[in-house]
């Protein structure tokens, strides 16, 4: 296929569908640290990343698996876990001396109320300055896990658990 001087092969990460270089260029040119939110099937990962000539440098990282240390008993890939991971990320970023960032959701679809925006809400509630619009954030009921408790009797105490963990993380902010 790539035979001849007129054929241009796209970058490898673009061919694999792993990087949107148009979006990445806009984020890197902004010259501010990026709050990178990635979701997996089991966890939410939030990182503070700066772009350098040698490659991106991660300054601070928080993973939803760390929430167990604070007493969180729910699933680590849902909306309340994303919110709490954002809070934990803000606490770590504040300790590292960072107080602002811009959101990088990567190839995630920007659906209002999505888990990536729950992590954003957690980081903003934790004291980071990140530009955003109110219409994209999930409702308070979803951040606390009331939608989970409504259909699952076993998870009825998730609202209390989320509030306890949020209080424990906010203590760390002080």
Swiss-Prot record:
The upper taxonomy is: Archaea, Methanobacteriati, Methanobacteriota, Stenosarchaea group, Methanomicrobia
Q: Which GO terms describe its biological process?
A: ribosomal large subunit assembly; translation
Q: Name one GO cellular component term.
A: cytosolic large ribosomal subunit
Family, per entry: Belongs to the universal ribosomal protein uL18 family.
Report what the protein is called.
Large ribosomal subunit protein uL18
**Self-association or partners: how does it assemble?**
Part of the 50S ribosomal subunit. Contacts the 5S and 23S rRNAs.
Write the record's keywords in alphabetical order, separated by commas. Answer: Ribonucleoprotein, Ribosomal protein, RNA-binding, rRNA-binding
What is the stated purpose of this protein?
Answer: This is one of the proteins that bind and probably mediate the attachment of the 5S RNA into the large ribosomal subunit, where it forms part of the central protuberance.
* Record has rRNA-binding as a keyword: yes
Q: Which NCBIfam families match?
A: PRK08569.1 (NF006342)
Q: Name one GO molecular function term.
A: structural constituent of ribosome
UniProt keyword Signal present:
no
The coding gene here is rpl18
